[in-house]
Amino acid sequence: MRSFYATIAFFASTMTALQAEQTQPASYCPPRPATAEEQRAIFEQAVQTIIVDQQYTEGVPRHYDEGYIQHDPFLLSGRQNVLDYLANFDPDSVNFTVINKGIDNNRAWIFQRVEQVGSEPLGWVDLWRMNGTCIVEHWGVSMPKPADAINPLPLW
């Protein structure tokens, strides 16, 4: 009898997990309305997948709008251009350390230390505009800490 209840509990937990997976959309784009809490959770998921786990081909199509607007002077707008750019980052030779992040009123930001083999570390800030569930616009600024810096405070 005890194994019967254990089997029922196992199947119930498996069904709950499968339902949770099925309720998560394949993509958050095109944009759909989202509460502030939903938007925060979606942004946290994007940071984890794209920045921390460096799973670009999974994260970018899920979180970036096809008509994504890019303000970086060295990159063109569009989701595919983001994927092409991120393909240059080898996860084995670049490390992104999230220092701070936040989201408020459809604006999200992240401050990170970026270390790439053969280069000095960078302080890197990304700013995004979200439309509901979807990232639709980006600004980014990065800078190395110069060797002759006079400010003793750390960059990151």
Give residue spans per PLM region.
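C-terminal and inter-domain tail/linker signature
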Residues: 5, 14-156
